[in-house]
Design a protein with these regions (language model features):
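A conserved beta-strand-loop-helix scaffold within acyl/acetyltransferase catalytic domains
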Residues: 3-31, 37-51, 55-159
Length: 159
């Protein structure tokens, strides 16, 4: 078998309970939390993001956040990404599965008429959670920054 259980997104109270039951506990990461209603590009903390977004715009990247119908294209981008980066493990970043992703917010990047990247966010009642990020090797620099920024903007607009 060679498999061990893993608890993902565990809070400190649950970790303490597992420790009492002799589980080994290891902190792996912290979530980056952004409050979209307070997000503003003109703040000093985002001074390095502004040039990235300008570079994406200058490169001709167009971001689409409307309903996704190009599932075969997104699947091909996922396959290209896996060929370059290795198989998706489905741990902290999700896997490409249409039934699963069809419930997500999806932002796609297009460059010279071809889709080159996308990001997906799980939408929950009070939060959006970045899940899948994929791109081709031909993606212009700063494209992923522009995709995440478009999702933050959409979350802000949707309240």
């Amino acid at each position: 078998m060679g498999k061990i259980p893993l608890v993902y997104k565990c809070n400190s109270r649950n970790a303490a309970a597992m420790r009492r039951h002799h589980w080994s506990i290891m902190h792996m990461s912290d979530d980056a939390m952004i409050a979209p209603q307070h997000f503003a590009l003109n703040t000093p903390a985002l001074r390095t993001l502004r040039p990235k977004l300008r570079a994406a715009t200058k490169s001709g990247i167009v971001i689409h956040t409307d309903e996704i119908t190009e599932w075969p294209t997104l699947h091909q981008i996922d396959q290209d990404w896996q060929n370059t980066h290795g198989a998706a493990r489905g741990g902290t970043i999700g896997r490409f599965e249409i039934g699963y992703l069809s419930t997500h917010f999806i932002a796609c990047a297009e460059h010279h008429g071809r889709q080159c990247a996308f990001v997906t966010f799980q939408k929950r009642r009070n939060e959006w959670c970045l899940d899948v990020m994929r791109h081709t090797s031909e993606m212009p620099d700063s494209t992923m920054h522009a995709l995440v920024h478009s999702a933050i903007t959409a979350a802000k607009e949707q309240g």
